[in-house]
Amino acid sequence: MPSIPVTLPSKPEASHAREVAFIGGIISTPLRLRLLSTVGKVDNRDEIRDFLASRRARISPQQAGLAPGGRRRVPGLRREEVAVLAGVSTDWYTRLEKGHITGVSEDVLNAVARALQLDDAERAHLFDLARAATTGPSPRRVRKVRPGLQRMLDAMTDAPAIIRNGRMDIVAANRLGQAMYWPVYQSRVPAPGRGPRPDTARPQPANIARFQFLDPAGHDFFPDWENAADITVALLRTEAGRDPYNKELTQLIGELSTRSDDFRGRWAQHNVRLHHTGTKAYHHPAIGDLVLDYESMDLHADPGLNLTVYTAAPDTPSHDALRLLASWAATLAQPDQPHDADAQHA
């Protein structure tokens, strides 16, 4: 897919202003500042404002147990109604929605979460935003995927398994996982403003999000592309709330927002989610259709990494397809996995 280079003005001041105007409302303030290379204190007020406003807009008075009242200019609850439901003053909630979240107690955050009917993922995201408002960036360490993790993956011989980081980089996989995600490993999406990556270049991490939004093959690999894309963006949004100072993550979000209308629209919705179990459909170029159950878990001994294992119910076409995938995997050379560059999670 051809790249879409971003032409920047020659003056840094003009560049800054135009980029903010372009990205404003799509990427939160911390991410915007990082993308613009303005090093300094990061303010996440815009992110808090947009998240709370988006959650407030989706709840009708009837859903909240309130009388509908008169005509409304915008959908959803009014700020004063959220304040009543949360048991705080209107002025106080208004300040909170404007991003003044520093020092807010857990009890108050929980009350707001209940008033806005946040699910578990959204509640965790709100607390992540509050935490980011009171803490600064911590030193980041580059870690290799531990040998024990790779041995664990390799011991799983009948099920595809991958380990990814918060950027959606596949940082480790077993043989079946490599075979299943072969199209992602083989993707040659060019970097912004550059041509395709030559085969002699240093291997880059296999990134599910870049493949999904920037490589046309992503639409073939994910038959239910719309739903899969929703999940990917929600996972990235969740990770951005957890780690708003992660330069690699914010660069990825900036790239996808600039180059993909599909990503940009989804990012503006502020949806978040926890990704632990479910069923996904795939169309593998060598094997055909697969419908696989997955179990996903965060690796608490390795913060920032997530293990996902895929299985198929016995006596199903997908179970037979996994056997065929294993036979096909045996014919492949293993793709490069630059672990030392990709497992950044501290």
Language-model regions, residue ranges each:
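Short amphipathic recognition helices of helix-turn-helix/homeodomain-type DNA-binding modules
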Residues: 27-53, 104-151
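Low-acidity, Ser/Thr- and Arg-rich intrinsically disordered low-complexity segments
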Residues: 2-18, 28
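Recognition helix of helix-turn-helix/homeodomain-like DNA-binding domains
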Residues: 70-73, 79-80, 86-103, 113
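An N-terminal domain-cap segment
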Residues: 63-77, 135-148, 154-157
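Short basic helix-loop element that most often maps to the first helix and adjoining turn
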Residues: 46, 50-85
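Hydrophobic protein-protein interaction segments
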Residues: 147-167, 171-346
